[in-house]
């Protein structure tokens, strides 16, 4: 039995849920999200709560049970409060700028890296070495953050690169003579 899947999702005030078989549409003060689920699960609305139940007793249904519940919970949280990620850029001369709908990264390469900003994500740059990402879709926000980090992942010797704000980078000692 899934420990995550069996928990009901309480729908807060100001959030509307629309169910159409396995398609879930959730709208709230921050925006609207929809997702179609596959698999052997049933999504049921009971009073002010959403309940996800498996339809079969096989491994696929059990694994989708908890996953679907977590995705729906993140959708409800996203349209109500939104999600924020903070990225840190470490390195001499490393910086970020927003120009139009592109994020321009200067990361000690022969060229500047341009990344198109998705329409549902907002970027704020309080400093040149800090990137604040905001959005209602947790999955898309994480994917976009990983695209940014891939441009210059943190290296273990000097700690240069782009990383999540509170992520610890294991440092290595350099070569000895």
Curated annotation (Swiss-Prot):
GO molecular function: rRNA binding; structural constituent of ribosome
PROSITE patterns registered for this protein in UniProt: RIBOSOMAL_L6_1
rRNA-binding found in the keyword field: yes
Biological process terms in GO annotation: cytoplasmic translation
InterPro entries in the record: Ribosomal_uL6-like, Ribosomal_uL6-like_a/b-dom_sf, Ribosomal_uL6_a/b-dom, Ribosomal_uL6_bac-type, Ribosomal_uL6_CS
Keyword match Ribonucleoprotein: yes
Keywords: Ribonucleoprotein, Ribosomal protein, RNA-binding, rRNA-binding
Subunit record text: Part of the 50S ribosomal subunit.
Name assigned to this protein: Large ribosomal subunit protein uL6
Organism this protein belongs to: Rickettsia typhi (strain ATCC VR-144 / Wilmington)
